[in-house]
């Protein structure tokens, strides 16, 4: 379960970074 959470986090990080850069 923890591995899946880490994978989802790693997958969502680029989106968060690009969202922050757009501000």
Curated annotation (Swiss-Prot):
Expressed by the skin glands. The modification Lysine amide is found at residue 23. One of its GO terms (cellular component) is extracellular region. Its main location: secreted. Keywords: Amidation, Secreted. It is found in: Secreted. The keyword Cell membrane does not apply. Pfam families: Melittin (PF01372). InterPro entries: Melittin/Api_allergen (IPR002116). The keyword Ribonucleoprotein does not apply. This is Melittin-related peptide AK-23-1. GO terms for molecular function: protein kinase inhibitor activity.
């Amino acid at each position: 379960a923890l591995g899946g959470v880490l994978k989802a986090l790693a997958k969502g990080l680029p989106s968060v970074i690009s969202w922050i850069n757009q501000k």
